[in-house]
Amino acid sequence: MLSANITKRLPGISIEVSFDFDRGILVIFGPSGSGKTTILNCIAGLREPDKGHISLDGRVFYSSADHISTPARSRRIGYVFQDYALFPHLTVKDNIMYGIPSQCKKGKNYRIGTLDVLEMLKITHLQNRYPAQLSGGEKQRTALARALMVEPDILLLDEPLSALDHGNRKALQGELRELQRVWRIPFVLVTHSRKEMHALADEIIFLHKGKKETHVFPDMRRAGLDLANMSESSPTYAVSGFTV
C-alpha cells in the first residue's frame, strides 16, 4: 500500500494532500497548476516535502518526524515523464537499459530481460532506432519500457497520453490497463483529461489548488457514482470550480 501525507509550499500554491492507495490505477485529476506533478515528484524522491510521511508496503521513503529521506534511486519506483525524457543519442534499447546496474545487464539477480519488455510493449522492431526516428506513441512506449526495466514496486505516470493523437491515446489506454493487470503493482497517473480519467481510473483523487477535494473509491462507483458512463448530457460531478 502507498501511504502519502504531503505538505509542500511552492510559489503561488500550498500542497496539502493525504491518501492511501493499495491496488489498480489511481488517477489524480485536476487542472494545470493544481500540484499533480509535484505530488508525483515527492513520491519519487525528486522533490522533498516540507513535512509529512510517504511509505510503500511498510517501507518508509520520507518522514519529517523521523528525519528519513530515502534517495530516489533506492525507492524502486518507475516514473514515466510527460516529455518522455529519452536520450537523443541513444538507441531505444540503450535508452531502456540506461541506469540499470551492470550486474543486472549481465542477467544476475534480475527477473526480466530487455527483450521481454520490448515484446510486451510491441517495440522489439524499434530497438536499434533513435528517438528522432520514433512517433509519439513509440516514444511513450519506450519511456514505459525504461520505467519497467527497474522492476518497480509502483509506477508513476505524469500526463502520459497528453501529447498523443487519438488513435495512439486509445491504444495506450488499453495497454496501460493490461500492463497493470500483468505486473500487479499500483499505478499512480496524473491527468487533466476527463476522458483519460474515465478510461483508466480504479480510484480517483480530485485535486484543486493543492488540496484533495474528493477521493472516489471503487465501492462508491459500484454504489452509483458511475463516472465512466457519464456523457456530455449527463449531470456533471462538480468539484470546487471544475467539472468532470
Name each model-derived stretch.
Residues R184-V190:
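Conserved H-loop
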Residues L155-E159:
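Catalytic Walker B motif of ABC-type/P-loop ATPase nucleotide-binding domains
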Residues M149-D153:
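A short, proline-enriched helix->beta-strand linker immediately N-terminal to the Walker B motif
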Residues F61-G78, S102:
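ABC ATPase NBD coupling module
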Residues L90-G99:
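Short coil-to-helix segment of the ABC ATPase nucleotide-binding domain corresponding to the Q-loop/switch region
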Residues R59-S64, K108-L126, R177-E178:
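Conserved ABC ATPase "signature" region
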Residues Y130-L134, E138-Q140:
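Conserved ABC ATPase signature
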